[in-house]
C-alpha cells in the first residue's frame, strides 16, 4: 500500500479544476444533445448557465409524494450504469447524474448529499465517511478516509466525570470530514461541475421531502431527544408534535448551507461562514470544536487495501476501518475448509461462520488509527492464511465455546448507525461508500443556524475509565488523542476478478455490518444465489460478547417477512448457541456484474493475459439490489 496522501481541507474551489470540468461537460452535451432534449421534455433535466444541471427526476418526485415504495422494484438491471442506495429518491438522483455523462464519483457526491437530507438519522455533512473508488481506466482502487477526528482539545480522560457526554450532546462530536472527502474524490475523478451536484439535495431540503417509513420510525423512537433540542425540534416537529411517516419535512437552513458550499467550495465549511456558524452553535451547546479544528482537517487518500479471498480480490478501507481486515480474516478461515457447506444443508456452514466471526471480533480490537498506533503486526496476523488455518483447527463442528476461548483481551467497540450506497457507471468505474453520524441523529443536536445534525463519533473511541457490559478493559489502541480517528465497523467493498469489476457492496448497522456483508458475499459467490435472494435472505449476527446468536425474525416496511428457519435455529441450539430474536438487521446494498456466457468471459480475460495488455473493461449486465430491511430502492440508467 502506498503512503497516504494527506489532502488539504480545500479552503476554496479549485477554479482551474472547475473550468476543466465545465469544458468536459460541454463536450458531453454535444454527444448527448438529442438524448438530453428528449429527457428534458419528460422532466428529467433542465438547462442552466450553459451546463447540464441535474434535478430531481420526475420518477423521484412522484415517488416522494406517493410513498408507493412497494411499486418500485428492489432490483434493477442495466448495461449502462446502476445505483443501489437506501432511499429511492437518492438512487434516482444518482442515476440521473450518470445519464448526463457523470462519473460514478459525480453520482456519489449527489447521492451522499441527498441521503444526508432525507435520512438525517443516519448520515449528513456533519459526519464522516469511507469511500472506495475503483477506476477501470488504470485498474486501481483508491480509499478516501473522511472519518471524523477528535478535536484538538480532546483527551483520553475527557469523559471521566460524565460518561454520558461521550454519546449524547455536542461534546460527543468529532470534526466532520464528509465535505472535504467528497471534494477530494470529485477533484480526482469527477467529470461534471461541482455546483449542480448539490442542487437535488438543496431542492429537497428547501422545498421539503416526504418522511419515509424508516425515518418516521427513527423519529418516533427519539421523541424526547428531538423535542428537547431547539434545532432538532425546529426540523423534526410541528406544533409540539414530532413528524410522522407521510408528512413533509423542511430544513431551509441546511439548504442554505449546501448552497453556500456548492458556490464557494469546501472552504465555506472548513474556513468560512458555514463553519463559523456551526462552531458557534456547537460551542453554545457545550461542544469544544473550533475553527482551528475545521481548518486542520485532512482527508487521507491511499491505495485501497486489496486482499485475495476465495478467488476474488476484495478492495476496501485500511484501518481505522476494521471492516476489510475483519471480512478478509473470516473469509480466510472459511476458505481453509475443503467443503464449507455440506450436501445436507447450509446449517453447518453457518455454525462455522459464527465461530470464525467470534475469533475475528476478539482480534479486531487490536486495530486503531495507523497514524497514531502501530497496527502492522495485528493486521498481518489477521490477514495471514496460515493463522486462519490455525484458527480453523480450533473450530469444532459440534459445539461452541464461552468468550474467553477466543482469547479476547479488550472491550468491544459498539458503533452504530450509518448509510451505504454503491454506484457503477457505464465505463465500469465503481464507488462503494458508507457514511455516518453514528447513533440515530448522532449527538441529538442540530445546529440551528446551519441545519446540520452533529455526529457523536467520539463514542467510537475507547476511554480508560469506561465500564462496558463485557467487563473487559478498554482497548488502548483506540484511546482518544487530538486529530485521531476512531476504529470503525464500516465495510465498503469493491470486488474484482482478474482486474474486472465483479461487485460492489457494503452495509449500514454498526457492529452488524461485517456479519451482514460476509453473508451477502457468501450467498452470492459461494452459494450462487441470485443477487436479490443473496441480499434478502435472513441473517444471523454475533458480537462475541454477549455470547448470543441474534437471528432475524421480522416484517419489513414493505410487508415482507424475513426470518431464520426453525431447522437452522434447532441446529445451532444443539451446538450450544444461545439464540435471541432480532427485529431488524444491517442494511446491505449490492451491485453485481454478470455475463450471459461465462466461457466467453473467461476467454476474453485469457486473451488479455496472453497479449500482456488489458483490453477494454468487460461490460456485462449490472444488477443492483437495495435491501428491503430499509425503504431504499435501486435505479438504473
Curated annotation (Swiss-Prot):
Pfam families named among the record's database cross-references: G_glu_transpept
Tissue specificity field: Expressed in roots, cotyledons, leaves, flowers and siliques.
Source organism, top-level taxon: Eukaryota
Catalyzed reactions: an N-terminal (5-L-glutamyl)-[peptide] + an alpha-amino acid = 5-L-glutamyl amino acid + an N-terminal L-alpha-aminoacyl-[peptide]; glutathione + H2O = L-cysteinylglycine + L-glutamate; an S-substituted glutathione + H2O = an S-substituted L-cysteinylglycine + L-glutamate
GO cellular component, one term: vacuole
Listed GO MF terms: glutathione gamma-glutamylcysteinyltransferase activity; glutathione hydrolase activity; leukotriene C4 gamma-glutamyl transferase activity
Keywords: Acyltransferase, Detoxification, Glycoprotein, Hydrolase, Membrane, Transferase, Transmembrane, Transmembrane helix, Vacuole
Pathway: Sulfur metabolism; glutathione metabolism
Induction: By auxin.
Positions of glycan attachment: 50, 271, 374, 398, 553
Entry EC no(s): 3.4.19.13, 2.3.2.2
Active-site residue list: 418 (nucleophile)
Subcellular location: Vacuole membrane
Membrane topology field: Single-pass membrane protein
Membrane-crossing residue ranges in chain numbering: 28-48
Binding sites annotated in the UniProt record for L-glutamate: 147, 436, 438, 457, 460, 488-489, 509-510
Example GO biological process: glutathione catabolic process
Phenotype of gene-disrupted mutants: No visible phenotype under normal growth conditions.
Family stated for the protein in its record: Belongs to the gamma-glutamyltransferase family.
Described purpose of this protein according to its UniProt entry: May play a role in protecting plants from some xenobiotic chemicals by degrading vacuolar glutathione conjugates into cysteine conjugates.
Protein name (Swiss-Prot/TrEMBL): Glutathione hydrolase 3
Taxonomic placement: Eukaryota, Viridiplantae, Streptophyta, Embryophyta, Tracheophyta
Amino acid at each position: 500500500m502506498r503512503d497516504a496522501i494527506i489532502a488539504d481541507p480545500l479552503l476554496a474551489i479549485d477554479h482551474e479544476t472547475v473550468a476543466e470540468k465545465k469544458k468536459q461537460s460541454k463536450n458531453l452535451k454535444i454527444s448527448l444533445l438529442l438524448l438530453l432534449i428528449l429527457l428534458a421534455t419528460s422532466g428529467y433535466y433542465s438547462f442552466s448557465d450553459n451546463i447540464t444541471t441535474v434535478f430531481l427526476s420526475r420518477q423521484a418526485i412522484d415517488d416522494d409524494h406517493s410513498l408507493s415504495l412497494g411499486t418500485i422494484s428492489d432490483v434493477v438491471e442495466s448495461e449502462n450504469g446502476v445505483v443501489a442506495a437506501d432511499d429511492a429518491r437518492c438512487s434516482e438522483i444518482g442515476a440521473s447524474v450518470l445519464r448526463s455523462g457523470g462519473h460514478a464519483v459525480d453520482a456519489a457526491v449527489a447521492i451522499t448529499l441527498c441521503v444526508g437530507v432525507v435520512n438525517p438519522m443516519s448520515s449528513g455533512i456533519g459526519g464522516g465517511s469511507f469511500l472506495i473508488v475503483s477506476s477501470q481506466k488504470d485498474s486501481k482502487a483508491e480509499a478516501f478516509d473522511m472519518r471524523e477526528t477528535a478535536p484538538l482539545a480532546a483527551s483520553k480522560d475527557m469523559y471521566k466525570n460524565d460518561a454520558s457526554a461521550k454519546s449524547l450532546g455536542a461534546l460527543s462530536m468529532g470534526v466532520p470530514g464528509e465535505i472535504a472527502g467528497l471534494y477530494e474524490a470529485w477533484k480526482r475523478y469527477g467529470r461534471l461541475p461541482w455546483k449542480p451536484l448539490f442542487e437535488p439535495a438543496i431542492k429537497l431540503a428547501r422545498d421539503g421531502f416526504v418522511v419515509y417509513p424508516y425515518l418516521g420510525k427513527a423519529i418516533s423512537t427519539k421523541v424526547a431527544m428531538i423535542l428537547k433540542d431547539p434545532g432538532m425540534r425546529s426540523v423534526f416537529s410541528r406544533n409540539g408534535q414530532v413528524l410522522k411517516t407521510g408528512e413533509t419535512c423542511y430544513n431551509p437552513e441546511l439548504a442554505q448551507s449546501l448552497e453556500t458550499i456548492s458556490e464557494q467550495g469546501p472552504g465555506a465549511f472548513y474556513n468560512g461562514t458555514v463553519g463559523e456558524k456551526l462552531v458557534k452553535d456547537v460551542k453554545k451547546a457545550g461542544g469544544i470544536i473550533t475553527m482551528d479544528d475545521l481548518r486542520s482537517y485532512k482527508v487521507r487518500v491511499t491505495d485501497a487495501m486489496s486482499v485475495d479471498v476465495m478467488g476474488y480480490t476484495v478492495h476496501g478501507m485500511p484501518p481505522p476501518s476494521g471492516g476489510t481486515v475483519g471480512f478478509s480474516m473470516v473469509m480466510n478461515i472459511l476458505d481453509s475448509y475443503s467443503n464449507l457447506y455440506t450436501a445436507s444443508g447450509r446449517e453447518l456452514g453457518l455454525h462455522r461462520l459464527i465461530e470464525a466471526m467470534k475469533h475475528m471480533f476478539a482480534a479486531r480490537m487490536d486495530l486503531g488509527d495507523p497514524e497514531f498506533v502501530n497496527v502492522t503486526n495485528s493486521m498481518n496476523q489477521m490477514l495471514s492464511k496460515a493463522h486462519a488455518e490455525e484458527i480453523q483447527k480450533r473450530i469444532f463442528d459440534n459445539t461452541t465455546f464461552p468468550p474467553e476461548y477466543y482469547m479476547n483481551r479488550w472491550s468491544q467497540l459498539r458503533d452504530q448507525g450509518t448509510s451505504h450506497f454503491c454506484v457503477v457507471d457505464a465505463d465500469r468505474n465503481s464507488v462503494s461508500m458508507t457514511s455516518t453520524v453514528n447513533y440515530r441523529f448522532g449527538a441529538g443536536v442540530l445546529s440551528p443556524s446551519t441545519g446540520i445534525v452533529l455526529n457523536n463519533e467520539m463514542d467510537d473511541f475507547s476511554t480508560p475509565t469506561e465500564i462496558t457490559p463485557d467487563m473487559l478493559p478498554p482497548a488502548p489502541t483506540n484511546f482518544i488523542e487530538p486529530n485521531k480517528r476512531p476504529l470503525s465497523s464500516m465495510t465498503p467493498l469493491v470486488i474484482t476478478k482478474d482486474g474486472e469489476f465483479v461487485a460492489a457492496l457494503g452495509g449500514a448497522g454498526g457492529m452488524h455490518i461485517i456479519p451482514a456483508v460476509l453473508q451477502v458475499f457468501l450467498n452470492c459467490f459461494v452459494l450462487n444465489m441470485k443477487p436479490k435472494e443473496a441480499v434478502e435472505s435472513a441473517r444471523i449476527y454475533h458480537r462475541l460478547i454477549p455470547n448470543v446468536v441474534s437471528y432475524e425474525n421480522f416484517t419489513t416496511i414493505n410487508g415482507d417477512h424475513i426470518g431464520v428457519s426453525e431447522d437452522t435455529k434447532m441446529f445451532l441450539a444443539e451446538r450450544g448457541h444461545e439464540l435471541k430474536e432480532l427485529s431488524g438487521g444491517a442494511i446491505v446494498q449490492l451491485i453485481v456484474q454478470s455475463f450471459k456466457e461465462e466461457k466467453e468471459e473467461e476467454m476474453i480475460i485469457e486473451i488479455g493475459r496472453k497479449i500482456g495488455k488489458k483490453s477494454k473493461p468487460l461490460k456485462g449486465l449490472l444488477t443492483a439490489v437495495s435491501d428491503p430491511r430499509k425503504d431504499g430502492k435501486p435505479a438504473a440508467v
